[in-house]
Amino acid sequence: MSSWNEAWDRGKQMVGEPLAKMTAAAASATGAAPPQQMQEEGNENPMQMHSNKVLQVMEQTWIGKCRKRWLLAILANMGFMISFGIRCNFGAAKTHMYKNYTDPYGKVHMHEFNWTIDELSVMESSYFYGYLVTQIPAGFLAAKFPPNKLFGFGIGVGAFLNILLPYGFKVKSDYLVAFIQITQGLVQGVCYPAMHGVWRYWAPPMERSKLATTAFTGSYAGAVLGLPLSAFLVSYVSWAAPFYLYGVCGVIWAILWFCVTFEKPAFHPTISQEEKIFIEDAIGHVSNTHPTIRSIPWKAIVTSKPVWAIIVANFARSWTFYLLLQNQLTYMKEALGMKIADSGLLAAIPHLVMGCVVLMGGQLADYLRSNKILSTTAVRKIFNCGGFGGEAAFMLIVAYTTSDTTAIMALIAAVGMSGFAISGFNVNHLDIAPRYAAILMGFSNGIGTLAGLTCPFVTEAFTAHSKHGWTSVFLLASLIHFTGVTFYAVYASGELQEWAEPKEEEEWSNKELVNKTGINGTGYGAAETTFTQLPAGVDSSYQAQAAPAPGTNPFASAWDEHGSSGVVENPHYQQW
């Protein structure tokens, strides 16, 4: 732990000076008043001070006026957009790596590399080996540590690694490229589970679909922007341009994310009391204790039919999503005879339609639930099975039509219909087990990632010798979705599972530890230790509630990471 703290302190010192210049420029541009001195002279923390300045400047813009839970959703949307845009870079760049090509200006370019399409497919899919490995561990980490920091770490480091990828290509080292891809997958594998961990504290039950789908729509918006932008940059600038652009954007986003997001409403220094009370009252008692490896009901999770319904649905959706993300431009080039520069924008339309459907579906799903028109279980099943059923049907049309126009229209309709399913399986974890939502997301997304691993090889096997192999590719995608529809319709549930809450003795044991020592047993700060229920026979003198110290500077306290022994008095205290 000491080595981690030393590394963290060194990191603060390294970023302190450039962050100071950035915040000074922002303050000058907005006319913000200089903040109060955050710490005593001689004990200054550069990163804390300048992050507080950034937060104060942001509070004078639209960010300060935005409800904090929706600010989280919007920034998360941008983060997912960058993350999934990064995944489009390789697919666009590889089309110029293994054969000669003519750019839009008529100039013929000789390919720079001697790799075959098979070798490039292996390097591209290596991302998913890393992505798969961190799924279940990421779910546990997101339940154990502040999930907002974990999410920012995944996007920021993944973006930085994207900047390094062109170097691996230029030195013509397939091992280095594969290593960077695997490492990218490792760090970005934490993002989905971490975001589910964030919504555990920030999403009121009747807003779960809206908030979660707003955030996750970034995944599909990432493809909407990433496919045409990557194709444009590869065609008009260079094959390395998309890697650099997305890498820089991701690093900038990560800095903003760390400055303005917090683990819980109680930790946020500038959230309105109205919003804070609304969220906490709606969610109810959220345990301050966090699961340990021994306390997680692994057997119940693995044997739960509703959990497996989510997993099967996740795999089905992942199969088609990665199929299109990795091969849509290739399909349009080989099967439909389109140029890469021309097909980029057209390839984005299905994902654009899906993004719109996801947002509308989230609003409609929560409307049906909040007005008690349908039960949560009914909403999840109808949206998931309707979306997947429509996608499977249109995929059959794509597989067997001989008209290019019909194929494109059916592909747009298929991907668009799948948007309804996001209000089904993709938020279902929060319904059945909010305490373990991050872990369930890691579990289901990990198995779903197998689709990303196997899809490139299956597609290559079908299409290696003839463009007619694309019929088999889309037929298989349709059958996988019909399987997902059937399984989810039979076994899915929207009700809280009996194993989803901790046992009373585990809950009380951790609460008593917090009360007596003032230190959260999870290893990071938590101040709002309000105990509303006590086990029978326990003296009421154990009931306690930590209160903020009077006069606490909310900006300074929000970044205070050096807790002292004894009761934590700072309501915004958070420690990694």
UniProtKB/Swiss-Prot annotation:
InterPro entries: MFS, MFS_dom, MFS_Na/Anion_cotransporter, MFS_trans_sf. Pfam families: MFS_1. Expressed in neurons of the pharynx and the extrapharyngeal nervous system. Highly expressed in male PHC sensory neurons. The chain crosses the membrane at residues 70-90, 122-142, 151-171, 175-195, 214-234, 240-260, 306-325, 345-365, 382-402, 407-427, 438-458, 472-492. Keywords: Cell membrane, Glycoprotein, Ion transport, Membrane, Neurotransmitter transport, Sodium, Sodium transport, Symport, Synapse, Transmembrane, Transmembrane helix, Transport. GO terms for molecular function: glutamate:sodium symporter activity; L-glutamate transmembrane transporter activity; neurotransmitter transmembrane transporter activity. It is a multi-pass membrane protein. Disruption phenotype: Defective preference between different food odors. Abnormal repetitive turning behavior during male mating. Glycans are attached at residues 100, 114. Its main location: membrane. It comes from the Eukaryota. One of its GO terms (biological process) is synaptic transmission, glutamatergic. Residues 36-46 have a biased composition (Polar residues). GO terms for cellular component: excitatory synapse; plasma membrane; synaptic vesicle membrane. Residues 25-46 are annotated as: Disordered. Gene3D superfamilies: MFS general substrate transporter like domains. Residues 1-69, 143-150, 196-213, 261-305, 366-381, 428-437, 493-576 are cytoplasmic. It is found in: Cell membrane; Synapse. PROSITE patterns: MFS (PS50850). Residues 91-121, 172-174, 235-239, 326-344, 403-406, 459-471 are extracellular. Required for glutamatergic synaptic transmission. In AWB and AWC sensory neurons, required for the detection of preferred food sources, probably via glutamatergic neurotransmission from sensory neurons. Negatively regulates the turning step of male mating behavior. Belongs to the major facilitator superfamily. Sodium/anion cotransporter family. VGLUT subfamily. This is Probable vesicular glutamate transporter eat-4. It comes from Caenorhabditis elegans.
